[in-house]
Amino acid sequence: MSKNLKLFTVGNFEFRLQHLLIIGILSLAFSISMLIRSQGADYGFELNEFDPFFNYRATEFIVNNGLVEYFNWHDDRSWYPYGRNVSETSQVMLHATAATLYPIFGMGADLYDFTIMFPVVFGSLSVIVIFA
């Protein structure tokens, strides 16, 4: 069977067998990565380890205070006894992206639940980006 077999046409686009294979492979890869990434939910819908808790706290800070205040935030609850300047010592884009997408895709969910699902969805979407 030829991979260039024409299946049907939509407008000027000819849908071929190779397109169906690519869609199938990407769907399978997305599904498998979603299953692997969400295995932690088998033990409860909780944040595990210390980094996710800090990422949640930093995202919550941006949601409550705004991005400008985040760049001025000196966190005295970490790096005892002096604290730290968060914007200089952490992943700014991770926190900013989660805080920006929360009002859009949060669908009324709690921020805590959103920060649990955020890495699962974005990790699975990265499979498609890597394929491209």
Residue positions per predicted region:
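Short hydrophobic/aromatic helix or loop-helix immediately within or flanking a transmembrane segment
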Residues: 62, 80-107
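Acidic, glycine-enriched active-site microenvironments
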Residues: 33-34, 51, 83-84, 100, ...
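Extracytoplasmic catalytic/substrate-binding loops of multi-pass membrane glycan-assembly enzymes
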Residues: 44-58, 67-76, 86-97
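Active-site-adjacent bridging/hinge elements
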Residues: 29-35, 66-75, 105
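Start-transfer (signal-anchor) and selected internal transmembrane alpha helices
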Residues: 1-39, 50
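Asp/Glu-centered strand-loop micro-motifs enriched in Gly/Pro and often flanked by an aromatic residue
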Residues: 13, 42-47, 103-106
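Transmembrane-helix motifs of polytopic, lipid-linked glycan transferases
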Residues: 109, 113-132
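Short linear capping/connector segments at secondary-structure termini
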Residues: 18-22, 42-44, 73-84, 112-116
